[in-house]
Amino acid sequence: LWSLGNELQHHADMPFNDWGVTLYRLMRQLLHRYDHTRLTTVAMHPRYRNIDTDSLPADLAVATEVNSYNYRYMYFPGDMKRYPEKIFYQSEASTEAMGPNFFEMNLDKVMGLAYWGAVDYLGESLGWPLKGWNKGVFDMTMLPKPDAYFVKSMFSEEPLVHIAIIEKAGTDTQWNGINVATQRLSENWNRNQGEQLSLYTYTNADEVELLLNGRSLGVKKNDADPKLRNRIRWDAVPYEPGTLVAVARKAGKVVARHQLTTTGEAVALKLKPETTDWHADGKDLMMVRVTAVDRKGRRVLSAHDLLHIEVKGEADIVAVGNGDMASSELPVGDKQLAS
């Protein structure tokens, strides 16, 4: 599939004055000189009769070979009746509405979706001190955030369960016409004694049992409701040092586990290169993951020390980053806070 534009139908000031249809057709004709094997589309943010339920299809919806809508997956059922011969695609899906925007689609008629933006990026900040978009499920170093496992639970048949602690619920912010929540998640089990926590367990299994230092805190079923499916919420979970374990079961059998553990203080740094096959030829680029660990080699998520980085030999530091959009260190420097 080739996409030939984004929201072209919003641009009435084009010279053809037809909301992007002629431009799309010209681009498709040019594309077919090089590749006529793939279908073409344009990502649209459709007009509507009712913003929540019913679109008012733009001319581009008729012209394109695949109907691609940004965010408005709730329009698919009505437009499938209008255009029974069409294939649909959710070209931008919000990372703040994950779950419904996947489970509520008719996957026999919808190709799938692309999350915007699934990976954090510089630009489009929601306000200082953020330097860019931080609502992805992967940070800029490509480290998965807890809700990346929620996405995996939708697309993978591999049984899984993953604990995500809600650090900050916050309030919704309007951005580009959609609600963007300020909820922040973590896997940190170094906390204050007696603290009451809310958390999610992401799973594609039938049920999850939560255990704190071996004591069961209860069993909760996975909900079939698309707004709740694969995301089980727990409230008033008491903190105490030790281990918090989520056990997922399917048809009564244990199929997956995830454990959070209280760690000791950070005493060392662990370096892991992405590959050992690289050459000092001025062309190779290597990413090295630096992790703060305790005496048992466990990652210490509560460590926020300032790290100074030095390279010896035939290599130079190109950039450093900790994945935190609010961090004030420059990516072109040689120091960075652990995050």
Where in this protein do the model-derived segments appear?
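Aromatic- and acidic-residue-enriched carbohydrate-binding clefts of CAZyme catalytic domains
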Residues: 1-4, 331
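Substrate-binding clefts and catalytic carboxylate motifs of secreted carbohydrate-active enzymes
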Residues: 2, 10-15, 20-47, 58-65, ...
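Acidic/polar low-complexity surface segments
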Residues: 30, 39, 46, 321-337
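Short beta-strand/loop motifs in extracellular/secreted proteins, especially
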Residues: 205-209, 242-244, 288, 303-307, ...
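Short aromatic-acidic-glycine turn motif
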Residues: 220-222, 267-271, 309-328
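Aromatic sugar-binding surface patches on proteins
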Residues: 224-233, 327-339
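Short, solvent-exposed loop/turn segments enriched in Ser/Thr/Gly
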Residues: 282-288
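Short, well-ordered beta-strand segments enriched in hydrophobic/aromatic residues
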Residues: 288-292, 297
